[in-house]
Amino acid sequence: AARAPSGTNTQPWHVYVVHGEPRQRIEREVCAAHDAIRANPALAGDFRESYDYYPEQWVSPYIDRRRENGWGLYGLLGITKGDKDAMHAQHQRNFKFFDAPVGLFFTIDRVMGRGSLVDCGMFIQNVMVAARARSLHTCPQAAWNGFAKIIAPIIGMGEGELMVCGMSLGHADESAKVNTFHTPRVAAEDFTRWVG
């Protein structure tokens, strides 16, 4: 994974690998905060993302793809529109690392430019490919970003670091219904423009 390319070889990524008690503590504390926000939405302001992962205002075709993905997953799991309890429980699976024994948190130094997010993304993809080569499964998760202030002291993340995302690492339960869901993909013609 460390062979991922980066602009002028800056290699701006950091990765924290958690398991055992630190992983369990993160799960407990973030799930408690997630539940508290649900009970009192005003608390959400205390858990702001370090950067805008998603746009403030969604436009087509991105909102359409997001909805298709959500409807497909929730439909498979039997979660109906408006079932806030089931939606909350499903979202909270993120903060339980989807039952994986290992969690990873990826960061970059805040002084770096936005290009370092691209570099870190290539590093993250390499981690995922390397994991599959070893018969492991991964799930990259932006859901952790809003809870960096809980996670940072547990993992020893520096104040000058920006959390990019988290990731669950383990062996997928192939018998779980959720693992039969495959996210739809647009055709190559929809995102490729041949010039010349």
Model feature map: region roles:
Residues 2-196:
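Acidic, surface-exposed loops and disordered segments
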